[in-house]
Amino acid sequence: MKKIIRVGIGGPVGSGKTAIIEVITPRLMQRGIKPLIITNDIVTTEDAKQVKRTLKGILDEEKIVGVETGACPHTAVREDPSMNIAAVEELEARFPDSDVIMIESGGDNLTLTFSPALADFYIYVIDVAEGEKIPRKNGPGLVQADILVINKTDLAPYVGADLSVMESDTKVVRGDRPYVMTNCKTGEGVEELVDMIMRDFLFTHSEIK
């Protein structure tokens, strides 16, 4: 059976996780990648509805599923990811020719990581509006993620954040692990992020040719 790569996408509330999914999905599809999407909310499926609206006419809405976890975001993707695993397995069974399934966690703090039983890789999203010091906070989500996304770079002048300092601090705490700075409104850094996903997740670890 074909291996469908599972990619977790985590980060604090409002960092732009959903927006990242919305901008990378059509770009992945333009490169021949067939995606599936799962979103997590604690008491609603609002993110899934938002993604369906944004990607209407681009991705079949049956390939976008919302999971109402009823629990802390990290619990649903790490300590007890059973609800998400069930959703993943159901989507994979319905669409076995897919290449990647993106699993967006609910918004959480810098300690959020994904269980290896749920995700093969994960992307962690922070945003400039959280403050210049965020990379120095050194949380496991930020440090251990396979790719770190520093989103909303356009907000830097409004919150007094120096992007060069954020980038320098990121290199210190992450070493050689990849990161990218993005602006989903302008598309800045988005193609670079897609390049990373293709290179590090898909071409290297799947049957995509």
From Swiss-Prot:
Keywords for this protein:
Chaperone, Cytoplasm, GTP-binding, Nickel insertion, Nucleotide-binding
Where is this protein chiefly located? cytoplasm
- InterPro entries noted in UniProt: CobW/HypB/UreG_nucleotide-bd, P-loop_NTPase, UreG
The cellular location(s) given in this protein's UniProt record come to: Cytoplasm
Q: Does the keyword Manganese apply?
A: no
Q: Where does GTP bind?
A: G11, P12, V13, G14, S15, G16, K17, T18
The Gene Ontology biological process annotation of the record reads: urea catabolic process
Gene Ontology terms, MF aspect: GTP binding; GTPase activity; nickel cation binding
Cellular component annotations (GO), alphabetically ordered? cytoplasm
**Record bears the keyword Manganese:** no
Reported function: Facilitates the functional incorporation of the urease nickel metallocenter. This process requires GTP hydrolysis, probably effectuated by UreG.
Q: Which HAMAP family does the record cross-reference, listed alphabetically?
A: UreG (MF_01389)
> How is this protein organized at the quaternary level?
Homodimer. UreD, UreF and UreG form a complex that acts as a GTP-hydrolysis-dependent molecular chaperone, activating the urease apoprotein by helping to assemble the nickel containing metallocenter of UreC. The UreE protein probably delivers the nickel.
Q: Which family does it belong to?
A: Belongs to the SIMIBI class G3E GTPase family. UreG subfamily.
Q: Which PANTHER family match?
A: UREASE ACCESSORY PROTEIN G
The protein in question is named: Urease accessory protein UreG
Q: Which organism is it from?
A: Edwardsiella ictaluri (strain 93-146)
Which gene is the coding source of this polypeptide chain? ureG
